Structures are given as C-alpha cells and as structure tokens.
Amino acid sequence: MPNLREIFVSNATNAWGDQAMKSFIDLNPDQVMDAVETLGVRCTGRMLQLNSMENRVYEIEIENGLPESMWPDPENSPAHPKLLVAKFYRPGRWSKEQIQDEHTFLHELKDNDLNVIAPLIYQSQTVWPNPTNDLFFSVFEKRAGRTPYDLPKEEWEKLGRLLARMHLIGETKPAKNRLTLNPATYGDSNINAILQSPYLTDKYREVWYQAAKNAMQYITPMFDGIKNIRVHGDLHFGNILYREMEGPLLLDFDDFLNGPAVQDIWLLTPGRDENAKQIRGWLLDGYEEMREFPYHELQLIEALRTLRYIHFTAWISKRFDDPSFKITFPHFGSDEYWSEQIGDLFEQTEILSTGSQHST
C-alpha cells in the first residue's frame, strides 16, 4: 500500500467520460424502447422504471409476446410472454467481455436446471450496444416472486443446496474477465480510489487512511491459499425471490466475480450472535448435501465484512456525480459519515486483531 504522501489527490473528473455518463443519466423512454425494438419486438409504450442504483432497469410491455426464437424455455414458457426487463449498464464499470462472462455463467446455471434468470438470446448475442448512444443493454424474462423472510430450517437447507450446486458449476472454470475478490482488488485498489476522491476531506484523510491501513495488515495474510471460484458476489436477501412451487430464485449477478465460496454464505447470515450461527449451520447442512464446504473460509467473514465497508465507500465516491446518488446518500462526505466509517474500521480491526471470527 503506498504512503499517503505518494497519493495524488485531485478533484476527480468523471473517469468514464462526460458524454457516456450524460447519455446514461439522460436515458429516456423513447431511447429505451427504440433499443429494445432492435431485437425484433414491438413495444406497446407501457414501461416502468425499476429500482436500481448501479444500472438503469425497466419493465417493458411488448406486443404479441416474444418471438419463439427468444423464448427462455421453449417447453415451459407461456405462449406469448409480454413483459421484458431491459437492463442498461452503467458506462465504464464493465466491458462487453466482462458482461458476457456474467451471462455465460447464468446460462451455464440455467442449462443445469438452477433457478436463475438468464439473459435472452437474440441472433446468438445476449448484450448489445444501444444504437443511439452505445450504452450496453440486455433483456431478461420478467419473473415475479416475494422476498423471503423468517425462513424455516428446511428452507435454509434448500437454499444451501442451491448455492452448493451453483458453486459446483462455478468451480469448473474461472471468469477470465471478471474481478477476483481479494485484498488487492477490494482493499488496496478501493483505498487508493477513496484517497483520490474529493469527498474525503483533509480533516479525516489521515485518520481514515491509517484506520484502513491497520485493518488491511490483518486482512491481507488471511487470503493466502484461499481457493477462488465463480460466485454470485452480492447474495443478500434482496437478490433472492421465492416463487410458489419453485423455491428460491437467484437474481442480479451484476457483482459476479471470482472469490471464496463463503462470500455467498456470509451476506445471508451476517450476524455474530448465536441465532445467526444456528441459521448459518442450517444453510451449510443443506450445502454439504451437494458439495463439501471449505469451513476454514468462515474465518474470512470479518475480513470480507471490512472489505465490503471499504468497497461500498469507494463505490459511492466513484458515482457521486450521478444525481441519484446525491439523493440516496445525502450524508456522504459529511463529518458524520467519515466519523462513522472510521469507527467501523477501528471496530473491525479490533475484531480481526483478537481473532474473534465466525464459526458454526
């Protein structure tokens, strides 16, 4: 990690180019429907923008349904599915090749009967440039369901079996164009980005940097010898739907990457108390029915939690020129915000230094 004096701090200009971001922020319904209609469908004009901070996502009604060549499941699809979900990707985050890695994984999962929503295929492609502004977009089948809460033991076990099946496929090969979750990518790189951000003020710069640096001294050696496989990467309950007779449906693989298997476990059971450990045990009981779980990775939970804190701050700082981020995170960059972040890092460093790690 570089010395603080070696890091050049500037008023960050948009790293993705003003024109690309302007096109993304100004994306309008006509542009969205025009892009979708290049795939051989016709929109009715009815469209609903869905909740997404990272991308622009829309539910779109189409006339006469999908052409049969695009049906996600020709044997089981409704005769004429009329609702699509179109995702327009934030410029600069993922290349077309990186998006394609995600789509390839989703189709591998779908082809092995895992309950996921894979992108629709048109003329052998799943990701296309918007003809009016070159933003990449994809389309998906619309699926409904409910967010799960208070799952009984048997449902935790069922979810564990699903995750194990996903990891069995994930370990067959790496995602060659995606990130690997490790101290360098989620720690050092994000720390440098935050230090170069104009939103980290001089008042807190040195103390925040020291707090992050101290935490990283414990985190970095913990990843030695850890096996990386393809994982969901952001698997909390907001990214799972339950459908009657089908069970859990995994959503939003936008943060898909190479990483330890435990990354897809701890966000579902993030607590430190005995109840969280019991639930994690149920999840892993089901997991073990399909794949051997690397229990030594449970020692990474607090390290992964700390890296997520750092990554989340960097994520906001890189996007704070987007008006939607200013609305959603109005206290970002304030004294209160940085005091809280520093306190969290101090707390995590204390936990890491005493070896107070998770176990089942």
How would you name each of these model-derived features?
Residues 2-43:
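Juxta-kinase regulatory segment immediately upstream of eukaryotic protein kinase catalytic domains
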Residues 314-360:
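ATP/Mg2+ or Mg2+-diphosphate-binding catalytic cores
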Residues 123, 149-206, 228, 329:
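A cross-family kinase active-site recognition segment
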Residues 91, 136-150, 191-199, 312-328:
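A glycine-centered beta->alpha junction motif in the catalytic cores
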Residues 261-292, 308-324:
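Active-site activation/catalytic loop segments of kinase-like enzymes and analogous catalytic loops
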Residues 47-51:
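Protein kinase glycine-rich loop
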Residues 61-175:
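ATP-binding pocket architecture of kinase catalytic cores
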Residues 54-81, 85-86, 119, 216-265, ...:
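Active-site acidic catalytic loop and adjacent metal/ATP-binding pocket
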